[in-house]
Amino acid sequence: RALADMAHAQGVRIWFCELTPWKGYTRNLFGRGDDIQWSPELDALRLELNAWFQSADCPADGYIPLGPLADPNDPDALVPAYTTDGVHHTPAGQRALAALMPENIFEPQTQEE
């Protein structure tokens, strides 16, 4: 909220994107073992944040749903062609993500907003 307030004070609009599914991802930071691994409990946090992003309480000026990136056969995961590790997008995934961005996202904020 504080970052959004600072941005708004400078005339910058804030857009939030839906946090994409990440089932299948495991991070092994610095070879110390699996320090982050997908679980239903962690995924519930993603869903909770996505719900907040869409709520009236969220300070964002816009919300970008990314549902088409989810695997229709496993909505907790990305489309297999869009990722190799479960979270980072392949070039095909990046193109699909870019196609979901609204054209007006880069328009300057007007005084009425």
Kindly give the residue locations of the regions a language model identified.
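Catalytic His-Asp segment of secreted/periplasmic serine-dependent ester chemistry enzymes
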Residues: 20-113
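A short helix->loop->beta-strand "cap" motif at the edges of active sites that frequently abuts
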Residues: 9-14
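Surface-exposed amphipathic alpha-helices with a cationic face
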Residues: 1-8
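Structural beta-sheet core signal
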Residues: 16-18
